[in-house]
């Protein structure tokens, strides 16, 4: 999944994407609407703690949380991500879980 920390930063690959623009703890959904005001895209932010509690409430046990580092060979920009940003904050969170 996309790493929850990215919620606090603007989707910009350059230096402007390195400054916090909102609260990490703000769980207000991000909503894009069409001309009639209907939701056409929605993202629901949750913190790492929220996700860990979701895992436990679902009967799973968290074994590991993997936050892959930006690969040195990747010099591309994609959306709000670039080597500049990717070398400083994680873009992905992988929850490794088992059901006991």
Stretch-by-stretch model annotation:
Residues 1-33, 42:
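Conserved class I S-adenosyl-L-methionine
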Residues 2, 67-68:
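Active-site beta-loop-alpha junctions enriched in small/polar residues
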Residues 7, 72-74:
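Generic structural signal for helix capping and beta-alpha/helix-loop junctions
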Residues 23-33, 40-67:
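Short alpha-helix
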Residues 33-35, 76:
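Generic signal for short, ordered secondary-structure residues
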Residues 58-60, 75-100:
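Core SAM-dependent methyltransferase catalytic element
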Residues 68-71, 100:
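Short, solvent-exposed coil/turn elements at secondary-structure transition points
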């Amino acid at each position: 999944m996309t790493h929850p920390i990215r919620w606090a930063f603007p989707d910009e690959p350059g230096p402007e994407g390195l400054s916090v623009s909102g609260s990490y703890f703000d769980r207000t959904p991000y909503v894009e609407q069409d001309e009639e005001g209907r939701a056409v895209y929605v993202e629901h932010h949750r913190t790492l703690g929220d996700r860990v509690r979701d895992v436990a409430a679902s009967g799973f046990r968290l074994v590991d949380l993997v936050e892959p580092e930006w690969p040195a060979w990747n010099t591309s920009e994609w959306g709000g991500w670039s080597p500049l940003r990717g070398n400083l904050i994680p873009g992905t969170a992988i929850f490794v879980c088992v059901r006991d």
